[in-house]
UniProtKB/Swiss-Prot annotation:
It comes from Shewanella amazonensis (strain ATCC BAA-1098 / SB2B). This is Crossover junction endodeoxyribonuclease RuvC. The keyword Cytoplasm applies. Mg(2+) 1 binds at residues 8, 139. The RuvA-RuvB-RuvC complex processes Holliday junction (HJ) DNA during genetic recombination and DNA repair. Endonuclease that resolves HJ intermediates. Cleaves cruciform DNA by making single-stranded nicks across the HJ at symmetrical positions within the homologous arms, yielding a 5'-phosphate and a 3'-hydroxyl group; requires a central core of homology in the junction. The consensus cleavage sequence is 5'-(A/T)TT(C/G)-3'. Cleavage occurs on the 3'-side of the TT dinucleotide at the point of strand exchange.
């Protein structure tokens, strides 16, 4: 049984989603958003770090997965997003969690079946697959999709006789 924390990083809104996996079953445990309140980037990064530490304490995940950033609207946005990812990754490593990274295309493909899926399609599939009464908000749905992608990727590698740590995990130590 694994508890996976998925994170969709952002400097203003960071989505998180927690699922429990056993065999082929995925159970929704919780999700939401860390909304930063300060205009100062260092304060926002601390809010992300502190928020994720609290989520880690609450849910006690054994695995951590985060979306890998590959583009942004401009250089300043890319730098801020990278720093938000860094705050999230540090929160995971401080807790001793292995860190796995996935591209947006990998995540969408694992959950929707196509790497070009729209946000609404991701929300719908997350709702259906986790049997939720309503679609989660976009950032939380993306984070749940990250966790689900990690689970599917891990299961596929194990089924093929491989080790889940090969090519899947980015370890930060």
């Amino acid at each position: 049984m694994a508890i996976i924390l998925g994170v969709d990083p952002g400097s203003r809104i960071t989505g998180y989603g927690v699922i429990q996996c056993q065999g082929r079953h995925q159970l929704y445990l919780g999700s939401g958003c860390i909304r930063t309140s300060s205009d100062e980037l260092p304060d926002r990064l601390k809010q992300i770090f502190d928020g994720l530490q609290e989520i880690i304490r609450q849910y006690q995940p054994s695995q951590f997965a985060i979306e890998r950033v590959f583009m942004a609207k401009n250089a300043d946005s890319a730098l801020k997003l990278g720093q938000a990812r860094g705050a999230a990754i540090v929160a995971a490593t401080v807790a001793g969690l292995p860190v796995a990274e996935y591209s947006a295309t990998q995540i969408k493909n694992a959950v929707v079946g196509t790497g070009r899926a729209q946000k609404a399609q991701v929300q719908h599939m997350v709702q259906q697959m986790l049997k939720l009464p309503a679609a989660p908000q976009a950032d939380a749905a993306d984070a749940l999709a990250v966790a689900m992608c990690h689970y599917h990727t891990h299961q596929s590698l194990v089924a093929l006789g491989g080790r889940a740590s090969v090519r899947t995990y980015g370890r930060y130590r």
